[in-house]
């Protein structure tokens, strides 16, 4: 897994961090992020990161002092591994992602049109950002 991380105290400072991928647990899926947009709106997410909770959506890896974060982006991804009976490998989705190459989510509230990420750290965050549209 590789992430583009931003220093929370100075949005002009970024770094690329990589580590081995995490294991996919029961009911989880691995999404390969294909493309995303990064606009002035995303910079606003960084500026308001602590106030509104944007830094909490996608915790930065290898970040023991919590000084780095992942500014969320909107984009497209493909399901490359699925341990969830309701989601098939090869499906494509649109939603909220970290600026990274992969993301593990735990689909809940699955419908033919969409699902939400049920990962525990995202449950207190605004639900609209936890929703993924199935394409």
What is each model feature region?
Residues 92-135:
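NAD(P)H dinucleotide-binding glycine-rich loop of Rossmann-like/cofactor-binding domains
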Residues 24-36, 50-104, 109:
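Glycine-rich beta-strand-centered segment in the early N-terminal region that forms part
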Residues 8-42, 47:
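A short N-terminal beta-strand-loop micro-motif at the entrance of redox/enzyme domains
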Residues 1-8:
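Short, Gly/Pro- and small/polar-rich lid/capping loops
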Residues 1, 42-46, 69:
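Generic detector of short, locally flexible boundary/turn motifs and exposed helical patches
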Residues 46, 55, 130-133:
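Compositionally biased, intrinsically disordered low-complexity regions enriched in proline and serine
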Residues 11, 43-45, 61-65, 109-110, ...:
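Residue-level detector of solvent-exposed, low-hydrophobicity positions
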């Amino acid at each position: 897994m590789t992430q583009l991380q931003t220093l929370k105290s100075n949005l002009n400072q970024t770094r690329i961090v990589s580590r081995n991928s995490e294991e996919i647990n029961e009911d989880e899926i691995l999404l390969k992020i294909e493309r995303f947009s990064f606009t002035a709106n995303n910079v606003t997410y960084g500026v308001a990161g602590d106030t509104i909770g944007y830094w909490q959506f996608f915790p930065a890896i290898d970040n023991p002092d919590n000084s780095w974060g992942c500014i969320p982006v909107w984009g497209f991804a493909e399901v490359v591994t699925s341990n969830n009976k309701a989601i098939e490998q090869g499906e494509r989705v649109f939603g909220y992602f970290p600026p990274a190459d992969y993301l593990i989510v735990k689909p809940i509230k699955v419908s033919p049109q969409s699902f939400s990420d049920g990962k525990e750290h995202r449950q207190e965050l605004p639900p609209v950002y936890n929703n993924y549209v199935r394409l």
